[in-house]
């Protein structure tokens, strides 16, 4: 049997040579668990004569990755093999790779099709010695296999389908793309990115330094007008943004209701549903950046709109196809008045914005007065019990996980953009809260801080380092506003006027574990608060320093910060004594701030996978989970838990199987000590009340909002109702992003008896009616006895 080498020559397969190559990459790994010989034996079994060395390396990497459940070091080894393979297949010198990317000729039409901009290339070539020597290629070996495969699949630029960039090249391209001729700042950013202190968002990593540097993640639009022109102009904006890889939030509350008169044609409106189906097809057709991700639009509606009941049905799996639009995402923009009416089971009036104008243009007391006035004037199209609508909302959430819940009055009351007008919606991921209008499309550029990195070897948290990195991030995101490619003019108008940015986090759960703080402990709750205090303080300080140099943003005059009112003041909270807020307020009074908004903890799905961290502000969902790559699916055990069990001599095949049998929970495994059971509770074992309380604690330092998922293993209407009301009363802006539930049955252990199925189908319809009655009773019970109701102990 022979292999074909990279130079085209042939060589016989040598067991020792393969083992030696793997052995060289095992430095620093736990030799009690990692066995290169075993990997070689498995690799040899999968070989055939004429295999290339590239394929051999790929097979070796995947073989190591399948052993990740034995020990997390296998994921590191798998990545090292894959990275070493990439290094052999790519050029080393950064400036040469950038030249190749610029000189690319498309073989289909023989046209010069540069993949980076001429400006980027010129800067790189003018500073090539500094930039080339600043890159530390060994840092490529710090990724785990699944992080590296994510980079390889979507982030590293390719020439004719073959990866041309190494991860370090990409990070330097991004840094130069942001900082241009400021080489010192580019190298500083490169070092922080490559050492994994933080990461820019996916669109920034995809597009920085290219011909179309569309570096923004989030776009928010309000319908331009309730007319064919307004609707299709907005739809065109959505298509152009989606084409450039942006996620979108759209406020649709101004669109007239079903059956209302249209003066221009002397006809009647078809309402929201047909319009949303057009949006649905646009999202399917125009994906984000040419097949990188599917197009994604979230539609925001206020619950007084006459079409609200139809809106809540749109994502459901059953029902008439022409009444469904399942590729969109749905969100409610909820005024406090609705929550009050649900609580007291008052009446709720459904209205058409054409007959009752201005409801989406005001909030708080002004909204309540206008709404009551329209009710008294008899302008409502339909009156229902508020709890009837609430029931429909809960039913939709239980079935589809949506609509998202955002509280309109909290979003406006606690916004630094109150001086601009009423905020009408959030974005696709519910963490951006910005003003939109007919001539302004709100935009946000994001980055996330890897919190696990700030835990020292002495198990202390380095707040100073967190502050210094935050200040760099603010400067980077502020620069992106000026160098960004804007898919529509209205987005550029908005972003350059108000200059918002969004700083989030990832690895909060990892930081707690490294500090040995159980997620619900008082220590974790204090650290949670102080982390966000620090980020908010440092972000304001950095933005104030930028304002001293360049002046405050255009619409600064009259905003709460200009009056000395910061986010925690709006929440009526007092910070801890970690930072000197009085001194900062004095600085801001003198110089202002350069950015209207600063913090927005986002979901971080892809970038957390790249850096090997748990997502965002979330607890671990399971201690055993799957990672998919193109070659297949791999099972992974929480690396922190695996390390702890290994150190205590508790890790073996039997333990692994017990954790799998318990679906990733360790709470009922007798051999595991109590301190580890506390530390490794999954989100299903943590009180959601604590999750909501911690969201409110950090919320006092978050001037936008946060992507907050709610996890209830088996939701009933009572639990869900009590949980929503608790979040609302805590003052949250985002009450819920997704409702996550556990599947009704474990697919691995589930078999079905056909006779049983027939019996079940007979009894289902009568049980459905009983279930509905029980759900209604549970919902009412939880509203009447929110503090005592046992059903609602979430």
Swiss-Prot record:
Its EC number is 1.17.4.1. GDP binds at residues 202, 217, 427, 431, 604-607. Belongs to the ribonucleoside diphosphate reductase large chain family. It is found in: Cytoplasm. Gene3D superfamilies: 3.20.70.20. This is Ribonucleoside-diphosphate reductase large subunit. It comes from Danio rerio. It is an enzyme of class 1 (oxidoreductase). It catalyses: a 2'-deoxyribonucleoside 5'-diphosphate + [thioredoxin]-disulfide + H2O = a ribonucleoside 5'-diphosphate + [thioredoxin]-dithiol. Disulfide bonds join 218-444. The record marks 218, 444 as: Important for hydrogen atom transfer. The record marks 737-738 as: Important for electron transfer. Its main location: cytoplasm. DTTP binds at residues 226-228, 243, 256, 263-264. One of its GO terms (molecular function) is ATP binding. GO terms for biological process: deoxyribonucleotide biosynthetic process. Keywords: Allosteric enzyme, ATP-binding, Cytoplasm, Deoxyribonucleotide synthesis, Disulfide bond, Nucleotide-binding, Oxidoreductase.
């Amino acid at each position: 049997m022979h292999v074909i080498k990279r130079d085209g020559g042939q060589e016989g397969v040598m067991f020792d040579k393969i083992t030696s190559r793997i052995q060289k990459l095992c430095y620093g790994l736990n030799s009690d668990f990692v066995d290169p010989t075993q990997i070689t034996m498995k690799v040899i079994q999968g070989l055939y004569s004429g295999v290339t060395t590239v394929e051999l390396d790929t097979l070796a990497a995947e073989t190591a990755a399948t052993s990740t459940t034995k020990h997390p070091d296998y994921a590191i080894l798998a990545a090292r093999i894959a990275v070493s393979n990439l290094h052999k297949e790519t050029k080393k010198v950064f400036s040469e790779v950038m030249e190749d990317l610029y000189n690319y000729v498309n073989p289909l039409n023989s046209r010069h099709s540069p993949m980076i901009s001429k400006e980027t290339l010129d800067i790189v070539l003018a500073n090539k010695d500094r930039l080339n020597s600043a890159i530390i290629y060994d840092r490529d070996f710090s990724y785990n296999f699944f992080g590296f495969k994510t980079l390889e699949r979507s982030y590293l630029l390719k020439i004719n389908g073959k990866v041309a960039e190494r991860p370090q090249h990409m990070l330097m391209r991004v840094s130069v793309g942001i900082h241009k001729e400021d080489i010192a700042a580019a190298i500083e950013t490169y070092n922080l990115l490559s050492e994994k202190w933080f990461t820019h968002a996916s669109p920034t990593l995809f597009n920085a330094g290219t011909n179309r540097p569309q570096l923004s993640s989030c776009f928010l639009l309000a319908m331009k007008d309730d007319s064919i022109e307004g609707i299709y102009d907005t739809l065109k904006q959505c298509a152009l943004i989606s084409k450039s890889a942006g996620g979108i939030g759209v406020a649709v509350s101004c669109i007239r209701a079903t059956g209302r008169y249209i003066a221009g044609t002397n006809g009647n409106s078809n309402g929201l549903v047909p319009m949303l189906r057009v949006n649905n097809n646009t999202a399917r057709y125009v994906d984000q950046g040419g097949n990188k991700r599917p197009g994604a639009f979230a539609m925001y509606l206020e619950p007084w709109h006459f079409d609200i009941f139809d809106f809540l049905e749109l994502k459901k799996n059953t029902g008439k196809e022409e009444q469904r639009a399942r590729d969109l995402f749905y969100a409610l923009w909820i005024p406090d008045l609705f929550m009050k009416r649900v609580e007291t089971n008052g009446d709720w009036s459904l209205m058409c914005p054409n007959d009752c104008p201005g409801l989406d243009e005001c909030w708080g007391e002004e909204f309540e007065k206008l709404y009551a006035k329209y009710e008294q004037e008899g302008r409502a199209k339909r009156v229902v019990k508020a709890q009837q609508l609430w029931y429909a909302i809960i039913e939709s959430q239980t079935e589809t996980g949506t609509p998202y819940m955002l509280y309109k009055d909290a979003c406006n009351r606690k916004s630094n953009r109150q001086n601009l007008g009423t905020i009408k919606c959030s974005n696709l991921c519910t963490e951006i809260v910005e003003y939109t209008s007919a001539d302004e499309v709100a935009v946000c550029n994001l980055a996330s801080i890897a919190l696990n990195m700030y835990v020292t070897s002495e198990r202390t948290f380095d707040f100073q380092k967190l502050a210094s990195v935050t200040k760099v991030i603010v400067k980077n995101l502020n620069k992106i506003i000026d160098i960004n490619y804007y898919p529509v003019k209205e987005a550029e108008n908005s972003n350059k006027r108000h200059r918002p940015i969004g700083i989030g986090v990832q690895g909060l759960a990892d930081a707690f574990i490294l500090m040995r703080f159980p997620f619900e402990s008082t220590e974790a709750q204090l650290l949670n608060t102080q982390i966000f205090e620090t980020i908010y303080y440092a972000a304001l300080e950095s933005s104030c320093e930028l304002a001293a140099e360049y002046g405050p943003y255009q619409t600064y005059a009259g905003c709460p910060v200009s009056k000395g009112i910061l986010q925690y003041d709006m929440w009526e909270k007092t910070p801890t004594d970690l930072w000197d807020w009085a001194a900062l307020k004095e600085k801001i009074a003198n110089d202002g701030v350069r950015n209207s908004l600063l913090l927005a903890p986002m979901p971080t799905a892809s970038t957390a996978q790249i850096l090997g961290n748990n997502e965002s502000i979330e607890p671990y969902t399971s201690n055993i989970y799957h990672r998919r790559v193109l070659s297949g699916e791999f099972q992974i055990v929480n690396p922190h838990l695996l390390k702890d069990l290994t150190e205590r001599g508790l890790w073996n095949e039997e333990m692994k199987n017990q954790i799998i049998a318990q679906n990733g929970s360790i709470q009922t495994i007798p051999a595991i000590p109590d301190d580890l059971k506390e530390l490794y509770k999954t989100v299903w074992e943590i009180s959601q009340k604590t999750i909501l309380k911690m969201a409110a604690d950090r919320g006092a330092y978050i001037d936008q909002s946060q992507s907050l998922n709610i996890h209830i293993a088996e939701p009933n209407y009572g639990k869900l109702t009590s949980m929503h009301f608790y979040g609302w009363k805590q003052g949250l802006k985002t009450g819920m992003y997704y409702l996550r539930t556990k599947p009704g049955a474990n697919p691995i252990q589930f078999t079905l008896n056909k006779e049983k199925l027939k019996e079940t189908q007979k009894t289902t319809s009568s049980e459905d009616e009983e279930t509905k009655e029980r759900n209604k009773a549970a919902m009412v019970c939880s509203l009447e006895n929110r503090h005592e109701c046992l059903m609602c102990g979430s």
